[in-house]
Amino acid sequence: MTTPTFEEYSAQVRAKGCDEVLVREWAAGHQTPVHEHPFDAYGLVVRGEFTLTCGDTQRVVKTGETFELKRGIAHSEAYGPEGATFWVGRAS
């Protein structure tokens, strides 16, 4: 599968109801505490990888892979040795 451009990805997630699309960059080894968001999130990792933990479930999300998080879901993130960059659409 070919990685879409930022504009193509933005159009895809806006079609799912996203109001905004952001570029998020995280440093190598960065970790977030458990938190939740007041929006649905649709992301595409474009560089690096991170581990997404929701309860007892962990998933490593790598370059070229997508993830979805529904609003109000408690989760944490741990970024790999290269850090990560992802594009994320937010649906309020």
Regions found by a protein language model. Name each.
Residues 20-37, 71-72:
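Conserved short histidine dyad/triad with adjacent acidic residue
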Residues 27, 38, 54-56, 79-81:
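A generic beta-sheet turn/junction motif
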Residues 55-72:
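Short acidic-glycine-tyrosine-enriched beta hairpin
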Residues 71-92:
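Ligand-binding loop in jelly-roll beta-barrel domains
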Residues 36-52:
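Short, conserved beta-strand element in jelly-roll/cupin
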